[in-house]
Amino acid sequence: MAGEQNIKYFNIKGRMEAIRWLLAVAGVEFEEKFFETKEQLQKLKETVLLFQQVPMVEIDGMKLVQTRAILHYIAEKYNLLGKDMKEHAQIIMYSEGTMDLMELIMIYPFLKGEEKKQRLVEIANKAKGRYFPAFENVLKTHGQNFLVGNQLSMADVQLFEAILMVEEKVPDALSGFPLLQAFKTRISNIPTVKTFLAPGSKRKPVPDAKYVEDIIKIFYF
């Protein structure tokens, strides 16, 4: 088991969830420190946040900010970034695609009325019309159990997370994508993934009205 890491964020999914996933799948213990007030966040902004933004992860004597930088460091450290430069580039490419999809969903709870309805349609259309067909084809062409090479990578973890996020909004999103369905089953059976999916883990629940209220209070009141 790797050394414990310290992460600072809100007690929500947000941009930290991809980091939680990667640490958990790598089998890394991590401690969470949550912001519950605007004052707590402001204090950190004034002291250690390089760009006055979270998430932040304390790891190997560093205070890392910026989600992608954190993800790449964790992936490199725990052998989830491929065996050579070509695999590295492919993994980053696939990960960036899934991050684009996940960012569509992250903002969804904060929308209202017609804008929220339109965003749900956009999520469904882009998942089923752009991203899932692309990854279905990657799996078909590659012919392996994973997206790159034949071992688990950051790209697999993020695609799995993206699938779960989409299915929370569009339950039938994987219909018509048999290879992605099989991929989801394979990844869900990895022991560390099973553990993170189980009740009582540090995985955060689907955002609800309280989630939105808490974040608005911290940022705007």
From Swiss-Prot:
Pfam families (alphabetical): GST_C (PF00043), GST_N (PF02798)
UniProt superkingdom: Eukaryota
Binding site for glutathione: 9, 45, 53-54, 66-67
Annotated GO biological process: glutathione metabolic process; xenobiotic metabolic process
Sites of N-acetylalanine modification: 2
Domain GST C-terminal: 84-208
Leading EC class: transferase
Enzyme Commission number(s): 2.5.1.18
Keywords, alphabetical: Acetylation, Cytoplasm, Transferase
GO molecular function, one term: glutathione transferase activity
Annotated positions of the N-acetylmethionine modification: 1
Gene3D superfamilies reported in the protein's UniProt record: 1.20.1050.10, Glutaredoxin (3.40.30.10)
UniProt keyword annotation of Acetylation present: yes
CDD domains for this protein: GST_C_Alpha
PROSITE patterns (alphabetical): GST_CTER, GST_NTER
Quaternary data: Homodimer or heterodimer of GSTA1 and GSTA2.
Protein's job: Glutathione S-transferase that catalyzes the nucleophilic attack of the sulfur atom of glutathione on the electrophilic groups of a wide range of exogenous and endogenous compounds. Involved in the formation of glutathione conjugates of both prostaglandin A2 (PGA2) and prostaglandin J2 (PGJ2). It also catalyzes the isomerization of D5-androstene-3,17-dione (AD) into D4-androstene-3,17-dione and may therefore play an important role in hormone biosynthesis.
Family: Belongs to the GST superfamily. Alpha family.
Stated name of the protein: Glutathione S-transferase
